[in-house]
A protein has these predicted regions:
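Glycine-rich beta-strand-centered segment in the early N-terminal region that forms part
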Residues: 26-42, 54-96, 125
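N-terminal Rossmann-fold NAD(P) dinucleotide-binding loop
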Residues: 161-162
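C-terminal substrate-binding/catalytic core of Rossmann-like NAD(P)-dependent dehydrogenases/reductases
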Residues: 236-284
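Aromatic pocket-lining residues of Rossmann-like dinucleotide-binding sites
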Residues: 168
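NAD(P)-binding Rossmann-fold cofactor-contacting core
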Residues: 171-189
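NAD(P)H dinucleotide-binding glycine-rich loop of Rossmann-like/cofactor-binding domains
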Residues: 90-155, 165
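Glycine-rich cofactor phosphate-binding loops and adjacent beta1-alpha1 units
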Residues: 185, 189-253
Length: 284
């Protein structure tokens, strides 16, 4: 096959320096698909750290880079062993097809070349809301492991916090959500969003933090019921510490929820396409 294409891509050259560049894409193989991107989302959490230069270093990190881990588009060309056909709409969780420019995460481009195993077909009726599959899969992953419980308290009512709450409601829970910004306390269905200062309960068995605030751990431990669990599901740009005595007295468990897995993506695709999980009202 060995066809090559070019694309316009958003490139972060360095912190706080962004350009639109023409980039040569990797050659297309028999197991790849070429996707013309229709919509791509911007993460105001993780990708803001990339923009500001505050993203902690991890493998694959570096500049220049193409951001974007939540894109939707139509297949322009499909490799003979890809299992897809031109014209199919797919979700693309990023791409690494830009040569020396790092694909972290690689979806903010007019066209991408990506292994077919990385994409997933989406129902065209979802439209641009399908870019939320990555965040929805992240939300699903928080409580997908064996023995995990749906949250009683969620910290933060951004898009990820709302999706975690919606999934909890589907599972029969009615979580409380703490949100310090009064403008973000709207839009709750089946759960309550409050100012943390107004919370009278203060003892929760399962707490999920998606605020990204590395200084909150002691506060969360003070609100934990004995034997309870705190799940860190945000991304933190500073070290996290806590006072040991109160964690000891509560026999606290602290867990990190990392990146979603393919089974999480499939689960939220089924929930969204069946209409059980609403993705409405989340894109700003």
């Amino acid at each position: 096959m060995n066809t090559t294409y070019q694309a316009k891509a958003v490139v972060l050259e360095k912190p706080e320096s962004i350009v639109l560049s023409d980039l040569q894409l990797s050659p297309v193989t028999e197991t790849d698909v070429v996707v013309d991107i229709e919509w791509s989302g911007i993460s105001t959490g993780t990708e803001k750290l990339l923009w500001s230069g505050r993203m902690p270093h991890f493998p694959g990190m570096g500049y220049p880079l193409v951001p974007g881990y939540e894109s939707v588009g139509k297949i322009y060309q499909a490799g003979i062993r890809s299992g897809y056909k031109p014209g199919q709409r797919v979700f693309v969780p990023g791409a690494r097809c830009f040569g020396d420019v790092k694909g972290l995460f690689g979806g903010a481009a007019s066209r991408v070349v990506v292994p077919a195993s990385r994409v997933i077909g989406v129902d065209s009726k979802l439209g641009p809301e399908a870019v939320l599959f990555a965040l929805a899969a992240t939300a699903h992953h928080v409580t997908a492991s064996e023995g995990s419980q749906q949250p009683d308290l969620i910290i933060g009512h951004g898009v990820l916090g709302r999706l975690i709450a919606r999934i909890a409601v589907l599972a029969g829970k009615s979580p409380v959500v703490w949100e310090v910004d009064a403008d973000r306390r709207t839009g709750a269905i089946g759960y309550e969003v409050i100012d943390p200062k107004a919370d009278q309960k203060r003892y929760y068995k399962t707490i999920v933090d998606v605020s990204g605030d590395a200084s909150l751990l002691d506060t969360l431990i003070s609100c934990l019921a004995p034997g309870g669990e705190i799940v860190l599901a945000g991304f933190y740009d500073a070290p996290m510490t806590f006072s040991f005595p109160q964690a000891f007295m509560r026999e606290a468990r602290i867990r990190v929820a990392a990146q979603w897995q393919p089974k999480d993506l499939l689960a939220v695709k089924n929930l969204a396409e069946s209409g059980r999980l609403s993705l409405d009202g989340l894109i700003t």
